[in-house]
Amino acid sequence: MSENLSEKKKALEVALSNIEKRFGKGAVMPLKSVEKVQVETIPTGSLALDIATGVGGIPKGRITEIFGVESSGKTTLALHVIAEAQKRGGVAVFIDAEHALDPKYAKKLGVDVENLYISQPDYGEQALEIAESLINSGAVDVIVVDSVAALVPKDELEGEMGEAQVGKQARLMSQALRKLKGAVHKSNTALIFINQIREKIGVMFGNPETTPGGRALKFFSDMRLEVRRLGDVKEGGEKKGYRVKVRVVKNKLAPPFQEAEFDIIYGEGICKLCDLIEVATNLGIFTKSGSWYSYGDKRLGQGKEQVKKYLQEHPELIDEIDQKVREAAGLAGSNIEESTGEEGK
């Protein structure tokens, strides 16, 4: 019996080795494997989400889909990724197919709008050809396409109202992604598609939710992030933002199905200090007794707001705590700005 199991194990190892040679590392791996594919990443702006991805953020040289219902925080998350890439000296491009980007809001999130390249294409083919040219240049670190639903084929725009256009967008996406996949890998560009959730008509069993653009994007994406709005964030009875849950529904680089929750504050974006406090508490770096938080021998305050104020007054602690959190989670680098102002919130 043991000899039979040993032979099976050897046969499996040979098969996995051959698969890895043909399709790359991470094509098949144990679900609970601690080992992760080593890849360069861009932080998401949320420490909890960086940990949930298993690799520290949005992978470069790969395709990522961020999808969710309207006003769930998809574009906010993508803009935070752009801001993090720019902080590290990277070049970022925003392909605004929806023609809806607000530069003032982007600036509040930390985006260097003066050095952000933006394109507002007239139709889907133009948007994807622009993306392909930029990727092939090898000079761009991250490209965000907002959104797949707005990538309308030229034929559809030039056709008559009410004319059947079944499957044209799906074919467009399928053709484009076959070309883009290899180019993205060679250029080490992070390509992010923002997508919406729609409901299938007449579905009585199973999940009625779907995303526009056909199945190609689901197939070619190395990482898919589902963004859900949980509820309002209130302070003194006043709504100041909303709580978001992001689920990693597909991950070729680390075990999938991890989740992260964080707050998005109106006009400010992701509350990075709130995120840091929650993650540090969950990992045992902060201790909590009742509503009091402590860090080692230091008493930080009663309630999150007092802890935030304490950290803003002692910015040197932010980076120290951030590093400890990342080490405890198996990540490296820093994602929190040392700031005593609004950006540190």
UniProtKB/Swiss-Prot annotation:
Signal peptide: none
Gene3D superfamilies, per the entry: P-loop containing nucleotide triphosphate hydrolases
Swiss-Prot/TrEMBL keywords: ATP-binding, Cytoplasm, DNA damage, DNA recombination, DNA repair, DNA-binding, Nucleotide-binding, SOS response
Keyword check for DNA damage: yes
Compartment(s) where it occurs, according to its Swiss-Prot or TrEMBL record: Cytoplasm
Origin: domain of life: Bacteria
Principal location: cytoplasm
GO BP: any one term: SOS response
GO MF annotations, alphabetized: ATP binding; ATP hydrolysis activity; ATP-dependent DNA damage sensor activity; damaged DNA binding; single-stranded DNA binding
GO CC entries: cytoplasm
Record has ATP-binding as a keyword: yes
UniProt: ATP binding residues: G68, V69, E70, S71, S72, G73, K74, T75
Function noted in UniProt: Can catalyze the hydrolysis of ATP in the presence of single-stranded DNA, the ATP-dependent uptake of single-stranded DNA by duplex DNA, and the ATP-dependent hybridization of homologous single-stranded DNAs. It interacts with LexA causing its activation and leading to its autocatalytic cleavage.
UniProt record similarity statement: Belongs to the RecA family.
Name the UniProt record assigns to this protein: Protein RecA
Organism from which the protein derives: Aquifex aeolicus (strain VF5)
